Amino acid sequence: MKQLESFEIPRTVIFGPGAISKTPQVVAKHKAERILIISGKSVTANYANEVAHLLSGYSVDVVRYDEVDTSYSKYDLVLGVGGGRPIDVAKVYSYLHRAPLIVIPTSASHDGIASPYVSYALSQKMASHGKIVASPIAIIADTTVILNAPSRLLKAGIGDLLGKIVAVRDWQLAHRLKGEEYSEYAAHLALTSYRIVVSNAFRIKNFTKEEDVRVLVKALIGCGVAMGIAGSSRPCSGSEHLFAHAVELLLGEKNNEAIHGELVALGTVVMAYLHGMNWRRIKRVAKEVGLPTTLKQIGIDADVAIEALTTAHTLRPDRYTILGSGLGKEAARRALETTELI
């Protein structure tokens, strides 16, 4: 008999033109007095200040993500306004101090805008605090704001969504071979997000209209809900993400060109090949929307790619994927050459 299950998902999701103006109504539901707004460094700081102005009746501090003192516990509500880093730091603060979290994304480059989890790099850095899990109580996605984000970031959001088909296949494999717990519902949600973006990819690829962003945001939020239901990032992060993380770790500070969602899209192609899936279709969609289809296009040489593919399985030994116990260098080279990623 299965044991008791529980999960947390956002209670309130508001998205569309001008959604940011609804922030006071959302905040009012939570009886907060002292509010911390965590922002980015540039344009996102302007949006954070706009939110602070809307909340002028409260005690509000706006702090850049790289200046937040996570040990300071005086706030009873935290808002993450910006892209990945401000939202991740807001999740950390929320987790450490049990402060409710509201996410206000200014871009849509990955599914972190709705998930309870932080990036791999930050989770490793914060490992001494345990697994960082902070499900947003609300997501306010102003599609007018997101439409103004660089189109490359929005296309990276499509890249991140392409990965869901491999992530679910990896999860199914782990369920069959290792007896890992599997949620059909969470997997279906993740795959639905993948299908939504693939079926609309050609129409939305230029992100010239609000409705284009709306499709992307809906799909990314669906992924966040899938992870909340699964109780892990499993339905949305498999071998394709391990490859992306491995590349990012190898490049470190030298990574000046590659965006996470772009790496995920490329990882999806090679992992689909290893799974025996139709990797050419995935690559065709990536090309249609203007995502890179070779590693060279984003400044990654063959040696780094091969090293990443042979070491990716070591990043999360607890997460079984198509990589199994790892690929040898020749097998990795062959996979990357066959898929014409190098």
UniProtKB/Swiss-Prot annotation:
Amino-acid positions noted as binding Zn(2+) in the UniProt annotation, renumbered to this chain: 160, 241, 260
Binding site for substrate: 111, 160, 245
GO MF annotations in UniProt: glycerol-1-phosphate dehydrogenase (NAD+) activity; glycerol-1-phosphate dehydrogenase (NADP+) activity; metal ion binding
Coiled-coil region(s): none
GO CC entries: cytoplasm
Annotated metabolic or biological route of this protein: Membrane lipid metabolism; glycerophospholipid metabolism
The entry's keywords: Cytoplasm, Lipid biosynthesis, Lipid metabolism, Metal-binding, NAD, NADP, Oxidoreductase, Phospholipid biosynthesis, Phospholipid metabolism, Zinc
Record has DNA-binding as a keyword: no
Chain sites annotated for binding NAD(+): 84-88, 106-109, 115
GO biological process terms held by the UniProt record: glycerophospholipid metabolic process; phospholipid biosynthetic process
Record's keyword annotation contains Metal-binding: yes
Transmembrane parts of this sequence: none
Cofactor(s) this protein cannot do without: Zn(2+)
Subcellular location: Cytoplasm
Superkingdom as given in the UniProt entry: Archaea
Enzyme Commission number(s) of this protein: 1.1.1.261
One Pfam entry name: Fe-ADH_2
Catalysis: reaction(s): sn-glycerol 1-phosphate + NAD(+) = dihydroxyacetone phosphate + NADH + H(+); sn-glycerol 1-phosphate + NADP(+) = dihydroxyacetone phosphate + NADPH + H(+)
Subunit structure comment from the entry: Homodimer.
Family: Belongs to the glycerol-1-phosphate dehydrogenase family.
Role description: Catalyzes the NAD(P)H-dependent reduction of dihydroxyacetonephosphate (DHAP or glycerone phosphate) to glycerol 1-phosphate (G1P). The G1P thus generated is used as the glycerophosphate backbone of phospholipids in the cellular membranes of Archaea.
Identification of the protein by name: Glycerol-1-phosphate dehydrogenase [NAD(P)+]
Gene name in the database record: egsA
